[in-house]
């Protein structure tokens, strides 16, 4: 089934999104997870039976986009994640005294063309989001111009692939 996300949020249920790597999200891309949550919430609404309102037939597919907007989904990935971790007092938003955890994305790319002109925040979920150009974690730059600054990714990726292959072989 599809989680009744809007109903749960309206009832005050704390909900957050996150990624922890290949075990649960092969891309380890939080924007992809936020987009998926948004689309599933919209599909869930679209599956509702038509109803009559003010003498007019209303279909769920007409209401889906308003049920979960890109900003709603981004809130789940930021403030929502901080809330469910019990850290809303220090994470989840750009605010004085909070951890400086920030990801920055270019909006002048082909994948963002058109969408970012009208709504750059929404375009992060509605367009094909690239990897972050800059990422700051607790005030420290860890990605600069799309490249990790804290580790050499080549050996890490090679080791990761070796372990994934070994795991698959062991499971066979």
Placement of each model-derived feature along the sequence:
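Active-site microenvironment of metallo-dependent hydrolases
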Residues: 25, 72-172
